[in-house]
Amino acid sequence: MGLQSLVALATHTGENNSYTEVEKDRQEQDGLVDNSMRALAKKFLWHGGSVYDAWFSCASNQVAQVLLTLPYSFSQLGIVWGVTFQVFYGLLGSWTAYLISCLYVEYRARKEKENVNFKNHVIQWFEVLDGLLGPYWKAAGFTFNCTFLLFGSVIQLIACGSNIYYISDRFDKRTWTIIFGACCMTTVLVPSFHNYRIWSFLGLGMTTYTAWYMTITALVHGKDPGVKHSAPNNLVQYFTGATNILYTFGGHAVTVEIMHAMWKPSKFKSVYLFSTLYVLTLTIPSATAVYWAFGDELLHNGNALALLPKNVFRDLAVVLMLLHQFITFGFACTPLYFVWEKIIGVHRSPRFLLRAAARIPVVIPIWFMAVIFPFFGPINSAVGSLLVTFTVYIIPCLAHMLTFRTAFARENAVEKPPFIMPSWAAVYVFNFFVVVWVFVVGVGFGGWASTVNFVHQIKTFGIFAKCYQCPNNSHRH
């Protein structure tokens, strides 16, 4: 037997032996040891736990409705700053997603040494913080994470009402939001992230079409007569736009749930980075092209589809984004379903219909808030500055620093520093930089600018706005 064959055999054997009992149980539950046609079809469409499934889930979740609001951010920042912040926050987000994955693996390894059984239990971020750092960190993680996911779901619902209006203005945006709120309630029927295999694949295809449709259409359309590119105009717009981009690459609030759905969670480490690199190939060309074509007009249109010419290609983009909104709503809301199941004591129940019925109350407040604050675009920045900053940037960095603060913890860490960081000291320095940067620029300046802009939207359109930024004045109030 050749050297390559021996290496392959050793690697294969090592991977098989490294499965925990929980992962073996999951393989049996998913039918991965059953080779019948029914089981194979189920595996292909429904049961996803590979690295590729995780990549599709991360990329699909990351590039949702923000694709339509990034041109608005470019009209606040300008092209140079817009591209710079996308690359910068994309890399920063990939780093903190890596930290979250390290903390998850560390938590799970410690708990399994204590013979804790996670069968029929989905591990969540606040539980990782509780196990590694105690109840106060659990409370912080729970508060920020759940609040962010709540508003993340609200944003997806607002996007549904905003998008469908550009196909049919028979109803105002508020009415469409109410209708789609009822439709999004069907996401209670998806058990976990494990079951988003085909949906993540289709969702990413939908956003890929929309991104390139926006890019090509804007370039073919050319510059509007008299178009102006005056961004950045003032500090409020500048930091609002920057914070929306921070929000764009802060979609890893569901990282732990996606990892837990994997058969080999330890392989997640670089998944988010590669998903971010793909997302950048969609967001940078589309936002740049649309801003180049329409310029400052985007300041009055949070949804880029409002300015693109109405034709069958735009209608297809709207329909595809609507379908993707359902998927992304499920991504944001499913962790909240898990939390609610745990609160009322049905999370480990083998009767899924009972769990699905128990999830319904979670959608009600989301539905209501989407009607109160329909500010598509500005709400992203507000959520980014006040919630995403802590949930997916500051807390993971601080938690990683505290978890491995002792020499003993560092020596016994499941995941050592990556090759790009030569030592633990380098990891600590970079984590400290992320915390300071995000707190000062994201929470401080971003929070100030986003709040000013959000209050301006309320004063201009009012809460419960019937048709936010509609061209038809009869729908505005």
Indicate where each model-derived feature is located.
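Membrane-interface "cap" regions at the ends of multi-pass membrane proteins
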Residues: 1-69, 76, 93-98, 120-122
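Membrane-interfacial loop- and helix-cap regions that link adjacent transmembrane helices
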Residues: 46-47, 102-145, 149, 154-176, ...
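Central hydrophobic cores of alpha-helical transmembrane segments in multi-pass inner-membrane proteins
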Residues: 65, 90-102, 181-189
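Helix-loop interface residues and adjacent transmembrane-helix termini in multi-pass membrane transporters
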Residues: 67, 76-80, 190, 262-265, ...
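Extracellular loop-to-transmembrane helix junctions
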Residues: 71-115, 119
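Hydrophobic alpha-helical transmembrane segments
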Residues: 73, 186-191, 368-374
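Loop-to-helix transition at the N-terminal end of transmembrane alpha-helices
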Residues: 77-91, 204, 275, 383-388
